[in-house]
Swiss-Prot record:
This is Dynamin-like GTPase OPA1, mitochondrial. It comes from Mus musculus. Disruption phenotype: Embryonic lethality at 9 days post coitum (dpc). Heterozygous mice are viable but exhibit an age-dependent loss of retinal ganglion cells that eventually progresses to a severe degeneration of the ganglion cell and nerve fiber layer. Conditional deletion alters cristae shape and respiratory chain supercomplex (RCS) assembly. SUPFAM superfamilies: P-loop containing nucleoside triphosphate hydrolases (SSF52540). Residues 589-836, 874-928 are annotated as: Stalk region. The record marks R194, A195 as: Cleavage at site S1. Residues 501-504 are annotated as: G5 motif.
Amino acid sequence: MWRAGRAAVACEVCQSLVKHSSGIQRNVPLQKLHLVSRSIYRSHHPALKLQRPQLRTPFQQFSSLTHLSLHKLKLSPIKYGYQPRRNFWPARLAARLLKLRYIILGSAVGGGYTAKKTFDEWKDMIPDLSDYKWIVPDFIWEIDEYIDLEKIRKALPSSEDLASLAPDLDKITESLSLLKDFFTAGSPGETAFRATDHGSESDKHYRKVSDKEKIDQLQEELLHTQLKYQRILERLEKENKELRKLVLQKDDKGIHHRKLKKSLIDMYSEVLDVLSDYDASYNTQDHLPRVVVVGDQSAGKTSVLEMIAQARIFPRGSGEMMTRSPVKVTLSEGPHHVALFKDSSREFDLTKEEDLAALRHEIELRMRKNVKEGCTVSPETISLNVKGPGLQRMVLVDLPGVINTVTSGMAPDTKETIFSISKAYMQNPNAIILCIQDGSVDAERSIVTDLVSQMDPHGRRTIFVLTKVDLAEKNVASPSRIQQIIEGKLFPMKALGYFAVVTGKGNSSESIEAIREYEEEFFQNSKLLKTSMLKAHQVTTRNLSLAVSDCFWKMVRESVEQQADSFKATRFNLETEWKNNYPRLRELDRNELFEKAKNEILDEVISLSQVTPKHWEEILQQSLWERVSTHVIENIYLPAAQTMNSGTFNTTVDIKLKQWTDKQLPNKAVEVAWETLQEEFSRFMTEPKGKEHDDIFDKLKEAVKEESIKRHKWNDFAEDSLRVIQHNALEDRSISDKQQWDAAIYFMEEALQGRLKDTENAIENMIGPDWKKRWMYWKNRTQEQCVHNETKNELEKMLKVNDEHPAYLASDEITTVRKNLESRGVEVDPSLIKDTWHQVYRRHFLKTALNHCNLCRRGFYYYQRHFIDSELECNDVVLFWRIQRMLAITANTLRQQLTNTEVRRLEKNVKEVLEDFAEDGEKKVKLLTGKRVQLAEDLKKVREIQEKLDAFIEALHQEK
């Protein structure tokens, strides 16, 4: 009822609105009116022929009695005939965005409420700790009032200062990585840093290696590495020297270099170097003077030599052997104090401690290099030149110290080797022996004095030097004992002169100037000099150096001309022998012969490129067919020929050819090409060159050939390219002309006839000689051959009955043959029947195939026209044509690889081998041998020695 009353009130309101709206102009937009007002407006203005558009949504017709449900009604804009249509897409977009905002806002409110509720739940789960507040002291709550944190922060160091004090992690990481690489490199010294297991399985004890052993092992390994690089450096220096010679030889004629004048002592040192090599090669000893420094180990030999050279140039050790090979030191005067080795151009500045350390290290490396494995000392000499202001000109040789006992770590023959080296130098009648004796030890412990007295019993070329006189004066109770030594009354030896020197306080870091000052100060204050036990000219190393130099040059002037005359006589004898034995040959030493042989070998390698392509392809094709013919006939042709029709034959052939090409054929082809290249290379290297052929190079050429072939490897990609080419060649079945057809038939006949001949020989060996050979050569058959002959005859009868018999015998056929033979009294085994059948059927098949081959000579027309004739199927001819074409294409491909790539690579290998042989002196001595080579070597050495001696003698006379 209340709804009906409410509707009636609404109708009255509407009617009143209509009455008052009669004055509204008609141009008022209808869209601005309310929906209800629009319906009233249209009912009172029928002149407006408005067309109501169809609503897109279902709706209800409203009246005054119906309920207005505006939230369910969706109206669309109304089109009027006189008003254009308007599009309100911004309004629709805004409405959608407003709806999205409400969704987001609602979600945010709901999420915040949920988060607050979760936080409250967690807060309620935390226990209340207010009851335990009494445990904390009261001053804790007031501590911030008494502590000024700002002052503490200022008192602490800054972050930059802390960073500067911190270790450099990059450097530490780099050092650790270097140590890790060093210890994991598999070096021999690696085990020194590992614990050694000495316990049982249950209880293991580890023993740590001492620091000294670790350092020694590291130094040993470092020295080995340096020795290796030292060899490389020497080889490079040798190459540089050879290149320098070549540059000088190719100098322009218009440019003349000024010849540097060498000093007298340098010329003499070069003579000694050449003589040293000559003596080592021919086990002889020259008689030119040199100062030989000998003494007991740790007697001070090296220190005396360093005082004379005015530089600490030798490695030093505390009581251990440091001089492991003779060191020849040539002293000469010069503006700068420098040292250099004979075989190196590097100069060491002896005024700089860095260069001195490098020189000592270099000498130690050279000594270790000279010492062979299993030895302690070496007789090979290290040549060193020292120049400086105030140095006395002479040549000294520092020898290893004489020992009395061989200690652990030394070779068993160390003592004898040192004695033999010392005797070899002291046996020279013109050598000056500088005998060094330690004054701080008892004279009875001396070993070297006995050795010197044996070599120079009259003391005509011996100078005695007493070292460590300062220690001797302190330790010896009777000073007269030192006087007896200096006067030559204590030791059983004689000498030209006696000297007393002081070579330092025992500190290896002392400089030469400090040692000289200490020596002069000691002798100025010494009781020995004040009491006239020692004379002034017998003390200090300076006086010793002057005396040794005077004695040295006196010996040189007396003996050098005699030595030159002896070499002149030797040269005359060698030249006479050469003229009598080799009058038409030039005198070529081993190096010159090697260069000549090198040029000949390279010319012969170049000859490989002169081989014609036709010759390459012929020998390649022939060699390849010889290698693969057995496989083609036995594994491809014969199995396929047993088939009944041409389709099966072609299928079998294609399958077997594909398998053969994929697996074996390319590899076989490369092997054949490599063997062919070797044969041609050997032919050029070994073929005689007529009367001009020199057999002295034969061993060298053979060695170069073998080493080059060993190093040469065929290109790895050759097989892959060959496989594709061979596969494509075998796939082709179209024979284009009659000439190719005839060539294939000839190729097939030749192959089958060769197999037939082999089969005939096998049958002949099986059945024995025929009646003609038995009568003419008196040969008989064995019992087994008779059985084979009877079996063969029986099987041939079977083949005559059935000309198209398959390749295998059936079991009943074997039984029939055996019964027939037994009926004639021949006992035969089934396996013997099968073996005989194999050869008999093989001969029958090959003869049939040859007859068929003759028939196919006229079959090219049928093949070309594709006629189907069962009596004339020439598929086997096509097979052999495919094989022949594959061989030709393969030979052509291999020839291109040979001429374009492999010959050049072989030539490169030959050059590398020759370069390696040129650097290996032992290899040249082994390969270039003979009386002629040795005689030329002797002539070259003797001429060089004589020329240097003559130049030295001339300069010596000019100096006089």
